[in-house]
Amino acid sequence: MRGDAERFWGLRPQRRLDWRDVDEQHCVVLRPRLGEGRLGRWLARHLSDPYYRIKLDTIGSFVWRACDGETSLSVIAERMRRHFGDSIEPVEERLGRFVQTMERGRLIRGLGDTDS
């Protein structure tokens, strides 16, 4: 069990979708309306707005920007703790749930099939 937790916190999630900064604290993830396949991309060219916009709050935007494929979850958690202070606790639980939700939603990759 301990090995699974260590492995989980050593993972380096990576963003799968395009995104835009709204301001210094917020960003928006751009999810294709018609999927990521060739047909979806072709059809999307004929839409005035081919994306769903997923607006992230301050904490979600902080995590999203850190999911660069190079930064481990343990480093992200420590940066969150330094940036947000006690208001973010329990940081490991919150971060773990959030990145798992993002992976299930196919927003990020790199968590594999971990259950932690």
Question: What is the meaning of each model-derived region?
Answer:
Residues 1-36:
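Hydrophobic packing positions characteristic
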Residues 1-11, 44-116:
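Long, charge-rich, low-complexity alpha-helical segments
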